[in-house]
């Protein structure tokens, strides 16, 4: 078994069904090996499309999408797709071919330092230097991409490594990484603070972002909102966290959001941001968002907490687990008057349209 065969075997172990890509010399050993696999390869017109298509599949399935491209221009062409996946927290495995190991750094034909180029917008990147490391690296890559705050991982594999004989293929059953241990369970002290603030609040609201969908926490969010009568708005990435016909859902906030959703968030006295970047598209003036309200920020990525605005109660953890813990608590709160006000906004704050009669047959 050569390195290219080992790569395909790793993908099969991870139950990968599709690989998007465009062949080139430095990735040809991999494409030759995958011909004998049940994995379907999907040829794209440009490498950027491979990253976007793999990212799109990941958005639909929740599992890491995979793309494979050649070195040099093939690798640099996927950068936009990788950056998009990083910004949207989408699990993506990008496999890039590379020139012979002994030629690295010599500026040979179609050599590019792709691991250095993508450093700022991948969760991690690998340059494979030993063919026997392939099983471990792929196991780690899939684990990193699909846990914590999900995102892209790049694996750069020189052509000589793809053609080298592997001594023994053993795919690891588990990952052991001392430096990577994302927080899943939220701190119960902080969770109880959230419950305490809900009991004090008269006008609470939840703003759900894409992190709720990525953690598969829609059911828990709906149960929590319905149990305590808390209205919910979403960012653009959070669309789908609740059915649009749910009376507790008030639509998308932000520049292109619903006017009544923005007003609801502005007038709230307790704002619970869950899995959402406090970015300009959702909040045009982040420095003003905490005026006259308490901000609770829940995110699986500790780096996102307080990134754009200070939170009174920061809570690091997976949204699904945090909502489950909150549902187990007894919270004494009632917000019917607030919901009635928001229903009035929803009925009255609608755009006035004057259709042109000439468009009607």
Question: Where are the language model's segments positioned?
Answer:
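Active-site-proximal loop->helix
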Residues: 33-35, 56, 99-121, 244-249, ...
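Phosphate/pyrophosphate-binding active-site segments
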Residues: 132, 292-361
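Active-site diphosphate/adenylate-binding microenvironment
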Residues: 4-8, 17, 25, 30-35, ...
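Short acidic-hydrophobic, aromatic-tinged amphipathic segments that line or gate anion-handling sites
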Residues: 44, 125-130, 250-254, 313-323
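Cofactor-/ligand-binding subdomain signature composed of acidic, glycine-rich
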Residues: 1-14, 133-201, 325-336, 344-348
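Anionic-ligand anchoring segments at beta-strand to alpha-helix junctions in alpha/beta enzyme folds, i.e.
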Residues: 17-55, 186-187, 193-271
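Structural signature of the thiamine diphosphate
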Residues: 17-18, 59-70, 75-96, 119-172, ...
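Glycine-rich beta-alpha junction loops
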Residues: 26, 99-100, 157-163, 210-212, ...
């Amino acid at each position: 078994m050569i390195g290219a065969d080992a790569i395909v075997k790793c993908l099969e172990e991870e139950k990968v069904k599709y690989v998007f890509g465009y062949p080139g010399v430095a990735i040809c050993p991999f494409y030759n090996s995958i011909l004998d696999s049940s994995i379907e390869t999907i040829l794209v017109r440009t490498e950027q499309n491979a990253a976007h298509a793999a990212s799109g599949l990941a958005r639909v399935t929740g599992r890491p999408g995979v793309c494979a491209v050649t070195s040099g221009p093939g690798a640099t062409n996927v950068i936009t797709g990788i950056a998009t996946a990083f910004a949207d927290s989408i699990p993506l495995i990008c496999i890039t071919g590379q020139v012979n190991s002994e030629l690295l750094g010599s500026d040979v034909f179609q050599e590019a330092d792709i691991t250095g180029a993508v450093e700022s917008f991948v969760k991690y990147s690998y340059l494979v230097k030993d063919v026997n490391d392939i099983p471990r690296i792929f196991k780690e890559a899939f684990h990193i991409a699909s846990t914590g705050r999900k995102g892209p991982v790049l694996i750069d594999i020189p052509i000589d490594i793809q053609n080298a004989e592997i001594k023994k293929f053993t795919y690891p059953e588990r990952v052991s990484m001392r430096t990577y241990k994302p927080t899943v369970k939220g701190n119960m002290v902080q969770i109880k603070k959230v419950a305490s603030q809900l009991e004090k609040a008269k006008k609470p609201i939840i703003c759900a972002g894409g992190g709720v969908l990525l953690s598969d926490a829609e059911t828990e969010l709906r149960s929590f909102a319905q149990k305590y009568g808390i209205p919910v708005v979403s960012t653009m990435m959070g669309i789908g966290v609740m059915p649009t016909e749910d009376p507790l859902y008030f639509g998308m906030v932000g520049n292109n959001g619903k006017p009544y959703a923005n007003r609801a968030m502005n007038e709230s006295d307790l704002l619970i941001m869950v899995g959402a970047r406090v970015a300009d598209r959702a909040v045009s003036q982040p420095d003003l968002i905490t005026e006259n309200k308490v901000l609770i920020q829940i995110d699986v990525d500790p780096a996102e907490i307080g990134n754009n605005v200070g939170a009174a109660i920061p809570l690091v953890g997976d949204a699904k687990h945090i909502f489950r813990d909150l549902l187990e608590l007894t919270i004494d709160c009632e917000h019917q008057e607030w919901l009635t006000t928001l229903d009035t906004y929803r009925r009255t704050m609608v755009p006035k349209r004057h259709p042109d009669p000439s468009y009607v047959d």
